[in-house]
Every structure is written in structure tokens, then in C-alpha cells.
């Protein structure tokens, strides 16, 4: 990233063909998954009229992703990573075809939606873990921070486009079109990924997978700095689970099917802006304090979201949450890489991703339960302000993270 500019440096896409292939595959994949992300909750809401059932689907998928991340970490360290990536992507596509066929039935099966969500969550996370493990070999460790920011921008831009497309498809063709195009897009991603070089795992002594994972957990618990970062990440993803209330809130705001897509696109849009303007974030003298404050601001935005009288104002609150959460997430990623020992980087990154998934699943379950007892407006506000109170307490408790200082990197002539 260029220190002299707020904007992200995209030069890696020009200088590293393998990373460019991953960039293209990831963008297509995110668009495909976005179509799926709109269709599943809307279909379940239409079938059951229950926010609890919508939350349950997200929780089950999140649980499967957590298991997949743990298993995927072991596979990525023992088998050729390119094969793991291709196998995981292809298997996900099969699950999407199943969702499409189920949606075409006269009476779609709710159980099938849940089971296929487990299938896709598990195999999708296998590919994510293998790709994370292979990234240093594709871009070099000196470029990992830049690659991480480009990856976030890719994910967010794809997440902005796909919900709006998904909303239009729902309004015109129904959920089967969303599932079918998601399957097609997933199989298309295999084409650029086939061009990747062989990605063998590094030579290392055999160790029982559970023993290796336990060592990572012990490090998280023993380090107030890294452990605090992971805790903030989990709470932030809990807040993002507010999306399970979108269908119910859309009814409250009397939104059309096409307008629902704007709710799903708002957070990724704000996060994309945050990633695109992240050029100077790495040079913050007090990244821990900035991380804590941006997280508190994100919680406040969610608390205000449900109170908005018009849906367009709710979209603004969601976009603000996306921007603040992107700032916090990029600081989390940077500090984890710099404060974690080299021998622990793989496990800590895997556990960080897994706890983000877990936070999302827990948040979805809690919001689904609140939605069954309270109005959607009250549920959204209670979750945001409740997390804000927890965040203020953490601001006081996480002293080492709050006081952490770093020396800003020197300006380079090339700016890269």
C-alpha cells in the first residue's frame, strides 16, 4: 500500500499472475454466493414466516463452516493445496445445484435447505483455509498486507453487486434463478484456479491435529493483545448477523423485493469504501485504540439502524457500519500478522477466521430468538446497543490493546 495516498495500491494484480487468477475467481465466487445469500433467507421467510427459522439456517451453515475451517487447516498442511481448493469449489457447486432443484419442486423441502446449507458451509470453508495457506506462496510474505486489503475490496465489491442482482432476480424469476446462477458461477471459478501452480504443503513433522489446535487456543488465551483482537472480531461479526432481520424489517418498511437487495448491499458497500481508502491505516501510531473506537462506532450504527423511520436511512446506517467494520477488520488483520509468532501464524489465522464464523452464527441465533419475542425494530436496536455496552467495557478492560503503539513505517520512494 502507498503511504503517500489514502487509496489502496493494486499493483499486485499486475505483477503476480497467480494472485490475479485468485482475484478473478474470488470475485466471481463472491457474486455467486451473494445471489445465494439473498435467496436462502427470503425463501425460508416465505415458507415459514419465522425469523427464528431464518436465523437457524445461518447458524447451521456457520457451524458447518467452523468445522470445515478446522478440518481444512489439517488438509491444507498435509495435501497439495491446489487440489484441495479445486475439490472444495466443485463440491460447493453440486450443493448449489441441489438448492436449485429443490426450489423448482411444487413444495420445496425446508429440511433440504438446511442440509444443503451444512454441505455448502463445510466444503466452502475447506477451500477458504487452503487458499489462505497458499497465499504467502502466491504473493510473497512481504506483500501479505497488500494482498489482504485487495482481497477485502474484492469481497466487498462483489457483495455490493450480487445482492442487488439477487433482489432483481427474486422480483422477476424467483429463487431458483438465484440458485442456478450461483451454481454456474461457482463452476466458472474453476477455470482461473486451474492456472495456479502446484501448491505443495511445507515439509513438517507429523503432529496430531488436535494437539496443534490446542496449542493455538493456548496462545490466544495467554496473549491479552492477540486474544483481545480475536474477541473484538467475534463481537463485530455478531453485529453483522443483523441481516437475518432484513426480510422482517423489509415488511415493516413496506419494501419491494428489488429494494430488499439494497439492505444486503449496504454493509458491503461501506466496507468496500473502507478498504479502498485504507492506504494509511497501516501507519496508525495507536492501531489498538483506533480498532476499539471503530468497533464501538460500528455497534452504535447497528443500534440506530432499526430505529430509522425510512428504509433509505437504514441503508445509510448499514453502510456506516460496513465502513467502520472494515477499518476495524483491517487493523485486526495487520496486528495479528505482526504480533503473532511465525510458527503460529497459520493456526491463529485459521482460528481467527473460525471465531468470526462462530460469532456470525451466534449472532444469527440470538437475533432469530429476539425476533420471535420482540419486534424486528426492537431486536435490531437491542443487539446494537447491547454490543455497544460490551464494547465500552472492553475499552476499559483491554488495557494492553488500548495502549499499544507502533512505529510508523518509513516512506519509500516507490510508494509500494
From Swiss-Prot:
InterPro entries linked: Enterobactin_exp_EntS, MFS_dom, MFS_trans_sf, TM_effector
Localization per record: Cell inner membrane
Alphabetized SUPFAM superfamilies for the sequence: MFS general substrate transporter
Keywords, sorted A to Z: Cell inner membrane, Cell membrane, Membrane, Transmembrane, Transmembrane helix, Transport
Family the UniProt entry places it in: Belongs to the major facilitator superfamily. EntS (TC 2.A.1.38) family.
Alphabetized PANTHER family for the sequence: ENTEROBACTIN EXPORTER ENTS (PTHR23513:SF9), INTEGRAL MEMBRANE EFFLUX PROTEIN-RELATED (PTHR23513)
Function (record text): Component of an export pathway for enterobactin.
GO MF term list: enterobactin transmembrane transporter activity
Residues in compartment: Cytoplasmic: 1-21, 77-83, 131-156, 200-218, 278-287, 337-356, 400-416
Record's bilayer topology term: Multi-pass membrane protein
Residue stretches spanning the membrane: 22-42, 56-76, 84-104, 110-130, 157-177, 179-199, 219-239, 257-277, 288-307, 314-336, 357-377, 379-399
UniProt-recorded name of the protein: Enterobactin exporter EntS
A single GO cellular-component term on record: plasma membrane
Periplasmic side: 43-55, 105-109, 178, 240-256, 308-313, 378
Gene this protein is translated from: entS
Chief place where the protein resides: membrane
Amino acid at each position: 500500500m502507498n503511504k503517500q495516498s489514502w487509496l489502496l495500491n493494486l499493483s499486485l494484480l499486475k505483477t503476480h499472475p497467480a494472485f490475479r487468477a485468485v482475484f478473478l475467481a474470488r470475485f466471481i465466487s463472491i457474486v455467486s454466493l451473494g445471489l445465494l445469500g439473498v435467496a436462502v433467507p427470503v425463501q425460508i421467510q416465505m415458507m415459514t414466516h419465522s425469523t427464528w427459522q431464518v436465523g437457524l439456517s445461518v447458524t447451521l451453515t456457520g457451524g458447518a463452516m467452523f468445522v470445515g475451517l478446522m478440518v481444512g487447516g489439517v488438509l491444507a498442511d498435509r495435501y497439495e493445496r491446489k487440489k484441495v481448493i479445486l475439490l472444495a469449489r466443485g463440491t460447493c457447486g453440486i450443493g448449489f445445484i441441489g438448492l436449485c432443484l429443490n426450489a423448482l419442486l411444487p413444495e420445496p423441502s425446508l429440511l433440504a435447505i438446511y442440509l444443503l446449507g451444512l454441505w455448502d458451509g463445510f466444503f466452502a470453508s475447506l477451500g477458504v483455509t487452503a487458499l489462505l495457506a497458499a497465499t504467502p506462496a502466491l504473493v510473497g510474505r512481504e506483500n501479505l498486507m497488500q494482498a489482504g486489503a485487495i482481497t477485502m475490496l474484492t469481497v466487498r465489491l462483489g457483495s455490493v453487486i450480487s445482492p442487488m442482482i439477487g433482489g432483481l432476480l427474486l422480483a422477476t424469476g424467483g429463487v431458483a434463478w438465484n440458485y442456478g446462477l450461483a451454481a454456474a458461477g461457482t463452476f466458472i471459478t474453476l477455470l482461473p484456479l486451474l492456472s495456479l501452480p502446484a501448491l505443495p504443503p511445507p515439509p513438517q513433522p507429523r503432529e496430531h491435529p488436535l494437539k496443534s489446535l490446542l496449542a493455538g487456543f493456548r496462545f490466544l488465551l495467554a496473549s491479552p493483545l492477540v486474544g483481545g483482537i480475536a474477541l473484538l472480531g467475534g463481537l463485530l461479526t455478531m453485529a453483522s448477523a443483523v441481516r437475518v432481520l432484513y426480510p422482517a424489517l423489509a415488511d415493516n418498511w413496506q419494501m419491494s423485493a428489488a429494494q430488499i437487495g439494497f439492505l444486503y448491499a449496504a454493509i458491503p458497500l461501506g466496507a468496500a469504501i473502507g478498504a479502498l481508502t485504507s492506504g494509511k491505516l497501516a501507519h496508525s501510531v495507536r492501531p489498538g485504540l483506533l480498532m476499539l473506537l471503530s468497533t464501538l462506532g460500528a455497534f452504535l450504527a447497528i443500534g440506530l439502524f432499526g430505529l430509522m423511520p425510512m428504509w433509505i436511512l437504514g441503508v445509510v446506517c448499514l453502510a456506516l457500519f460496513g465502513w467502520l467494520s472494515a477499518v476495524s477488520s483491517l487493523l485486526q488483520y495487520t496486528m495479528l500478522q505482526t504480533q503473532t509468532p511465525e510458527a503460529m501464524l497459520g493456526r491463529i489465522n485459521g482460528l481467527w477466521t473460525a471465531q468470526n464464523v462462530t460469532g456470525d452464527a451466534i449472532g444469527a441465533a440470538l437475533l432469530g430468538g429476539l425476533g420471535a419475542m420482540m419486534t424486528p425494530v426492537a431486536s435490531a436496536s437491542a443487539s446494537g446497543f447491547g454490543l455497544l455496552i460490551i464494547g465500552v467495557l472492553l475499552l476499559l478492560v483491554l488495557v494492553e490493546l488500548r495502549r499499544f503503539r507502533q512505529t510508523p513505517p518509513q516512506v519509500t520512494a516507490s510508494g509500494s
